[in-house]
Structure formats: C-alpha cells, structure tokens
Amino acid sequence: MHELSYATSVLNAILDAVKQQEELGRKVIKVNDINLEIGDLTLISLDQLQFVFEVISEDTICKGAELKAEMVKPKIFCNDCEFEGNLDTKDELEVVCPKCESRNIKLKGGKEFNIVNATIEFDDEE
C-alpha cells in the first residue's frame, strides 16, 4: 500500500505550510481541502489515499480535510509514425502506439504526484 507514503508526504507538506503561516503570525483554524494532481501511471487508488489520509490526519489541523484529485493521463509520442496524444492504458509494460502499434515510443507524464493547492481557514480576528 504505497498510498500511505503518499498520504504521509501530503500531510507533512501541508503541516509545514501551516507552520510557515503561523510563523508569519497568522492563526490557522483548519485545512478544508487539498487539491492534488495524480498521474494515472502512479497506480494510486484515490479511495485508499483518502482513507489513509483521514486516519493519519486525525490528530492534526488537517482532520476532516477533503483530498480532491485531478487524474493526469500520460502522453505518448511514437518515434515511427510521429503520433502524439493521450495514452489510454494504465500498464506501462503494454504500451504501443494506437496508430501503428509500434513499441518505439516515448512516454511523457503520467507519473505526477503534486499538491496543487489547499484551502486553509485563518482566524481573522487577530
């Protein structure tokens, strides 16, 4: 279950961002949601990622934060026929050009795992 390591990385990154805001004198009340960009070839289960994040964030300011993700399809470039487009398979080992069925291809992307942004609630009364 590699979702645990990804969820832990997300939690640590958000907690670091919260700490930075608090060092600037801003009081963080809660983290509402976290938007991610996840490549299809990472084989991450969003349901498992959300479940694990919920468990490990239980005693933090991120408790109850919703993980949202945009799944990113890998791009393919065929060196033989020069086809370029989205790849529909999730198995990197079975990749062939959809136009000429060549295996002489290059993959671009699909392995991303990025935090795009997070919605953080601040105490504005200070």
Swiss-Prot record:
Binding residues for Ni(2+): H2
Keywords, in A-Z order: Metal-binding, Nickel, Zinc
Presence of the UniProt keyword Metal-binding in the record: yes
InterPro entries tied to this protein: HypA/HybF
Binding of Zn(2+), residues: C78, C81, C97, C100
GO biological process: protein maturation; protein modification process
GO MF, any single term: zinc ion binding
A Pfam family that the UniProt record links to this protein: HypA
Record's function text: Involved in the maturation of [NiFe] hydrogenases. Required for nickel insertion into the metal center of the hydrogenase.
Protein family per UniProt: Belongs to the HypA/HybF family.
Protein's name according to its UniProt entry: Hydrogenase maturation factor HypA
